[in-house]
């Protein structure tokens, strides 16, 4: 269900996202299904003609509505595969946070009124609304994908991302969260 994400992005006035030719092609394809599922409209991004030699190179920044932005998040078939998809998802979430903070608390409250009925959570709407003023002071310093070291494996006719070794990935995650620590060793439960 993409309705809440589409509604939130539309309420923020859309997002300005850098796109490659490959992303445009796949995003336009995903827009058809995303539009059908949400009942929201979109305009396909016009593809440059001729097609660029390097389809992965960023061609420019495009203003995308909710359907387009969610479809952009769904792309997994570019050269960066599933790791690129999760990177796009993190990018969109970061842009939404920045745009919401710039819009102010009133806009955020209005978005909450619109999207809260579309989500499922154990936190009440009042609890979330009470957190918003505090959250306005936070910044997303950096994001990363996990696992950091991985391989692809076929499991029951599906391709999956599998951690190379859990121990190495736990060390990478610890380093990302807490900084370099030469003495850190994962617990025996991980090893």
Question: PLM ranges: what are they?
Answer:
Residues 6-107:
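Flexible, polar/acidic helix-loop-strand segments at domain edges
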Residues 64, 106-109, 113-191:
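C-terminal solvent-exposed extensions
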Residues 2, 55-58, 78, 113, ...:
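Sparse, context-dependent recognition of short Cys/His-centered cofactor- or disulfide-binding micro-motifs
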Residues 3, 23, 149-152:
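Short, solvent-exposed coil/turn elements at secondary-structure transition points
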């Amino acid at each position: 269900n993409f309705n809440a994400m589409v509604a939130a992005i539309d309420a923020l006035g859309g997002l300005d996202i850098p796109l490659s030719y490959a992303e445009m092609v796949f995003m336009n394809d995903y827009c058809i299904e995303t539009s059908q599922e949400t009942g929201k409209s979109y305009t396909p991004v016009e593809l440059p003609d001729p097609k660029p030699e390097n389809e992965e190179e960023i061609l420019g920044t495009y203003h995308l509505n909710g359907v387009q932005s969610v479809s952009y998040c769904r792309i997994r078939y570019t050269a960066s595969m599933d790791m690129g998809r999760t990177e796009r998802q993190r990018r969109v979430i970061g842009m939404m946070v920045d745009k919401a903070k710039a819009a102010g608390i009133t806009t955020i409250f209005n978005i909450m009124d619109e999207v809260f009925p579309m989500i499922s959570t154990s936190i009440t709407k009042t609890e979330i609304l009470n957190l918003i003023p505090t959250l306005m002071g936070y910044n997303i310093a950096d994001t990363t994908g996990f696992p950091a070291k991985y391989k692809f494996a076929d499991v029951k006719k599906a391709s999956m991302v599998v951690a190379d070794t859990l121990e190495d990935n736990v060390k990478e995650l610890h380093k990302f969260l807490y900084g370099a620590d030469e003495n850190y060793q994962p617990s025996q439960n991980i090893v």
